[in-house]
Swiss-Prot record:
PANTHER family: CHLOROPLAST PROTEIN-TRANSPORTING ATPASE, SECA INNER MEMBRANE COMPONENT OF SEC PROTEIN SECRETION SYSTEM
Keyword Transport: yes
Cofactor(s), by name: Zn(2+)
Family to which this protein belongs: Belongs to the SecA family.
Sites where the protein binds ATP: 87, 105-109, 510
Function comment: Part of the Sec protein translocase complex. Interacts with the SecYEG preprotein conducting channel. Has a central role in coupling the hydrolysis of ATP to the transfer of proteins into and across the cell membrane, serving both as a receptor for the preprotein-SecB complex and as an ATP-driven molecular motor driving the stepwise translocation of polypeptide chains across the membrane.
Cystine pairings recorded for this chain: none
Matches recorded under PROSITE patterns: SECA, SECA_MOTOR_DEAD
Organism listed in the record: Marinomonas sp. (strain MWYL1)
UniProt keyword Mitochondrion, yes or no: no
GO biological process: intracellular protein transmembrane transport; protein import; protein targeting; protein transport by the Sec complex
Protein name: Protein translocase subunit SecA
Amino acid sequence: MLGTVIKKIVGTKNDREVKRYRKIVAQINQLEESFHKLSDDDLSGKTSEFRDRLAKGESLESILPEAFAVVREGSSRVMGMRHFDVQLIGGMVLNEGKIAEMRTGEGKTLVATLAVYLNALSSKGVHVVTVNDYLAKRDANWMRPLYEFLDMSVGVVFSGQDRDEKKAAYLCDITYGTNNEFGFDYLRDNMVFRLEDRVQRDLHFSVVDEVDSILIDEARTPLIISGAVEDSSEQYRKINQLAPLLVKQEDTDEEGSVGHYVFDESQRSIELTEDGHSFVEEWLVEQGMLAEGESLYAAGNLSLLHHVHACLKAHVIFKKNIDYVVQGDQIVIVDEHTGRTMAGRRWSEGIHQAVEAKEGVTIQAESQTLASTTFQNYFRLYEKLSGMTGTADTEAFEFQQIYGLSVIVIPTNRQVQRKDFNDLIYMSTEDKFEAIVLDIEEIVNQGRPVLVGTASIEYSELLSNYLVKKGVKHNVLNAKQHEREAEIVADAGRPGAVTIATNMAGRGTDIVLGGNLQVELAKLGENASEDEINALKADWKARNESVLAAGGLHIIGTERHESRRIDNQLRGRAGRQGDVGSSRFYLSLEDNLMRIFMSDRIKKMMMALGMEKGEAIEHKMVSNAIEKAQRKVEGRNFDIRKQLLEYDDVANDQRQVIYRQRFDMMVSEDLSEAISAMREEVVTSLVDEFIPPQSIFDMWDLEGLEEKARNEFGLELPVAKWVEEDKKLYEEPLRQKILDTFVNDYQAKEEIAGEQPFRAFEKQVLLQVLDTLWKEHLQTMDMLRQGIHLRGYAQKNPKQEYKRESFELFQGLLEQIKYEVIQIITRVKVQSAEEAEKIEAARRLQEEKTTMNMIHDSLDSLSDGGSDSADGQEYPKVGRNEPCPCGSGKKYKQCHGSLV
């Protein structure tokens, strides 16, 4: 109570921040008139003036008012759009590396231009991040005229671009792209062998659109570049037959409960019971996949166990038309937050292969991780990070904790007039959908458009069937119809339009009341007459006014999402820029959120009220209880994301060390000093193994040392002979003599090859060894991560154990890199340029002969009475119709003559 009173007197922290920004807005407004008088050339010339001032030491903050005034004036001239005062505040929030929460329709794309322009003045590059390629290209093309007018270059990165195009896009002042593309380019840059093949510059400043979707919803999805490994598709196909035989254990609390697996729906986790293990082992023995008497948990059978778990998850957890769709011969993942399909994305840990087996499509090979990171760790690499969204305040704590980003709620330009009605809760899904259809019919009869948000493709199609039966015209926007997205959204605001859409997050398009005039004008084409354009504008104005008079857009939610933010995003589609509108959520006790987290309590309440089929309960107390359940789920999801980050932070520290070393190797022209240091460490380690430090002669294993040097390094070290010849050759002098032998071998090779070629060879060896061992290390880390939770059963802290073991693994990796580099350089046989040319010429000649033999063999196998294959001897000159001298029995022109 006291806190509320103080807030009313002093204002919230957000209010105080907005008040501070308004003082700077006043300065920008004072400059407006003088900037309005400037010519186009003088206005665009301000960019080079600002750059000069920054180069002389002025700060961005000192030129902010002028820079924002320039962008506002430029936008008015080029695009016919003037930034509102609240949009200027949004630009300041972004410039300070914070998150601007702005309601739908408040012009986030235009707001970004302010901070983007200001930070691009440093010529270090600014990245504008969107959720998909379509929005990246759309926003770049939309804002390009403004930026180019202000003498700024604009580029777009997208999947499928060649390296030169991508590099050029990154060299622009402003680069648009998706979070995936920026992240994957970062990983790819750390896999190239030449500095000139890198495409990204240092990560300077980033503005993330739909920041909650990218930094929170997708935070659990790692970015992985992978390569194929050994094919195990047949195992998935066989084990897929097992999954339908397994029975869920219904009540885990009762003793004697029967079942093969326990499924925790709230955690989306699944575990085999004791009965389940026995059943699976018996079945695998019957199928000949497991030896009699062997355990599924034996070290050699962990791959089988992995396949069993993956197939069980595919059948129980992953649902068709909810988690994925089948398109042709492929399984395509559906983004649970946006309802979009994610072509090219695959689940890891064998899940995707198991789903492919379940649906009977071609099973693609499993993959090995070559490089990986998370969005959390990638975006924390930027010097300055900011973001925009319509709904961030509910996740403000997480943004602050994980990314150090404050959330500032930007006041709306006009007062929100949307009415948010209490939820209606029904006993069953059927009752709920019947009520939704009645509501839709009533709203449509009033001449208002309706947007219905569903959580899955399955629900959108179910509701569509209800509406078809009632004869209600409607459009469905889900992962299966995403090609028509722009067209459907453009018409969604027309009078009486009904649009069913899976989660509207990240759609990037506002629903304009009366229909989207700009889209309709574009359809008319460039050749449209003035009369046609005016007629269309008049028609749109009449439609817009009729929808406003009827009450605006009505939003219907078919169930509550786990996150309040997603619900708020759906609601926010109505009431844009002060328009009227309304929203209501329809729930049933069979909805996932209700069923998993709170149905028993509400069910008892509904029974106590004597509710019957078709009746609903509507009460603020119920809506509050649901919100409380959502907070609980959000808290759980935050813990999961935080835990993921804590584990990935360990890997990230290692990743940064490896990537830093890799970069240093690429920029260095001479790595001989590094090689020398490695050689000394490796030789010391080698000698210590057979001649322990400060030991007596009897403890020395000279024979073992000679053998290892010969087998591992290809060097003859007559250590026993040296000791025999020189009785005073003690440990240290002997150690030095062995090192000198390695050094002499190295110098001899360098002299033969030439200094420059040998330096290039060293660099190549270092990079290749580092990459190969890093990939193996990632795989080991993955395996460690997957099984580390089992340490909890031994009363050990899994997180601490993971940190300890991963550190040990990393130390081992660094030692192994040194060892293998020295091993390769010492074992390599070096020829002079002349010798190399002779060997290459001989190789080419042999290759030509081999090719001839291979082709001859393949032709010979098709003939009826072929003889032995040719031995590659030279043949005398023969006529084309004469028998081939190889002895095949064919004419020369049909045999070896066909190759000439």
